[in-house]
């Protein structure tokens, strides 16, 4: 049983950062936070409360982890599960629900009550409508293995990735829903559920007054807030910052996130919440200021900066999402999809533009050579543009794809965020197959 509170205090108080795996641990290990509170660390954590009338769980993690989570919970408490609250409807938080339903049936206990925001069920319906797309983008985001496989994809030995489905075999929708607020009393414990948009439109955070504790879900994740994911639906940075400020005002003495380490101490918690809110607010304020002045999206992307002292915090490193992506999401939310470049309003096919550029350059080989030179000089953004044009102009050109694999592979290694690494790694693998060049 790890001393998670001691670990988080050391990281925060001393400004220590030992990599993303040190704060987001995937172990299914249960750690007791107090006699009535435990955290099971998994792909997303399960936070559990003893109430005197059964356990209350926040989230169930992924289906693949749920069995181990259940076993470790049972080693801690024999109490049946009374209620499961979904902090939001992402699959890494809800997919293990069936395990706890099955356990209740096998033990002759009542089915757990499932509680969530009214949009959770609508999210599941949307996931079914776009199931193939969600399987593909999660495979790409998480690098084609590991978490992607856990989300419904399968890979045979040496065979191409087989995309089966996204999410659990059966969606368990909340049977108790709410719009803005819901107060629950389970046993001797009160749970005040509050809706706030943030990473999703169906998110809740909970204040548990008897413990002076907050369950944050993904509103706190020990990385830069995931408000810009380039392959996912809309995020809400303004509302996210508001939620963090509301949590800060509670004066909590215990913070229980769904990813990362739990945090104890009123002042320490207030600082973390304030820093996260400030980081979102500064990206939002800079972006909206430039939008209101008529700037193009490209200019805003390359102008908005987050103060370095915030990015150095161990709980604000951009190792999952990053500020540049949040700018794109702010533009989409408040400004639509037209980026300010008239040529992009009704563009020519990308391949046609690439063929024209190759012709002007004197052939695809010229684009390849220049892309490699730019990559060697460290200008990876321009290098990627040119090598992408080369393969669009000549889709079967093995040397072009060899260069594309090299350049995207180099960029993948240099990037910090998992989202960037996933997309560039996917492009690298695509071209390696065509070029017949192994890494």
Regions found by a protein language model. Name each.
Residues 2-5, 289-439:
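C-terminal regulatory/interaction regions
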Residues 23, 30, 64-115:
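Active-site metal-binding motif and surrounding structural segment of the metallo-beta-lactamase
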Residues 23-77, 205-217:
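Conserved beta-strand hairpin/beta-sheet module of binuclear metal-dependent hydrolase folds
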Residues 36, 49, 59, 73, ...:
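Divalent metal-coordination and catalytic microenvironments
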Residues 58-60, 80-90, 115-117, 196, ...:
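Active-site neighborhood of phospho(di)ester-bond hydrolases with catalytic His/Asp-centered motifs
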Residues 122-195, 239-251:
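Metallo-beta-lactamase
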Residues 190-229, 233-245:
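Active-site-proximal loop/helix segments of hydrolase catalytic cores
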Residues 223, 236-299, 303-340:
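Divalent-metal (often Zn2+) His-rich catalytic cores of metallo-beta-lactamase-fold enzymes
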């Amino acid at each position: 049983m790890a001393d998670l509170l001691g670990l988080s205090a050391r990281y925060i108080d001393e400004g220590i950062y030992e990599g993303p795996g040190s704060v987001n641990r995937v172990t299914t290990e249960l750690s007791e936070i107090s006699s009535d509170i435990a955290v099971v660390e998994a792909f997303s954590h399960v936070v559990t409360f003893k109430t005197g009338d059964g356990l209350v769980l926040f989230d169930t993690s992924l289906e693949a982890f749920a069995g181990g989570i259940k076993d470790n919970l049972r080693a801690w408490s024999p109490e049946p599960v009374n209620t499961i609250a979904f902090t939001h409807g992402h699959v890494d938080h809800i997919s293990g629900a069936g395990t706890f339903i099955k356990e209740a049936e096998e033990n002759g206990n009542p089915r757990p009550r499932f509680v969530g925001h009214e949009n959770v069920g609508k999210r599941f319906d949307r996931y079914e409508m776009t199931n193939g797309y969600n399987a593909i983008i999660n495979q790409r985001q998480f690098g084609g293995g590991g978490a992607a496989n856990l989300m419904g994809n399968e890979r045979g030995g040496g065979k191409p990735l087989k995309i089966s489905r996204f999410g659990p075999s059966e969606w368990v929708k909340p049977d108790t829903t709410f719009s803005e607020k819901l107060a629950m009393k389970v046993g001797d414990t009160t749970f005040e559920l509050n809706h706030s948009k943030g990473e999703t439109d169906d998110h809740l955070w909970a204040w548990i007054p008897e413990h002076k504790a907050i369950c944050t879900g993904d509103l706190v994740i020990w990385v830069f807030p995931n408000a810009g994911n380039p392959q996912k639906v809309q995020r809400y940075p303004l509302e996210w910052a508001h939620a963090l400020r509301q949590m800060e005002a509670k004066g909590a003495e215990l913070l229980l996130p769904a990813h990362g380490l739990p945090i104890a101490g009123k002042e320490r918690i207030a600082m973390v919440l304030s820093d996260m809110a400030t980081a979102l607010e500064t990206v939002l304020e800079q972006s909206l200021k430039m939008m209101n002045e008529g700037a193009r999206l490209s200019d805003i992307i390359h102008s908005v900066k987050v103060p370095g002292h915030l990015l150095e915090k161990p709980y604000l490193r951009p190792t999952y999402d990053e500020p540049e992506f949040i700018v794109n999401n702010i533009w989409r939310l408040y400004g639509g999809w037209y980026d300010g470049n008239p040529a992009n309003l009704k563009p020519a096919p990308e391949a046609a533009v690439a063929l024209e550029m190759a012709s002007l350059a004197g052939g695809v080989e010229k684009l390849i050579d220049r892309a490699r030179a730019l990559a060697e000089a460290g200008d990876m953004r321009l290098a990627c543009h040119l090598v992408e044009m080369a393969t669009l102009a000549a889709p079967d050109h093995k040397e072009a794809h060899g260069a594309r694999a090299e350049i995207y592979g180099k960029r993948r290694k240099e990037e910090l965020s998992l989202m960037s690494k996933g997309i560039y790694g996917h492009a690298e693998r695509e071209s390696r197959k065509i070029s017949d060049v192994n890494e």
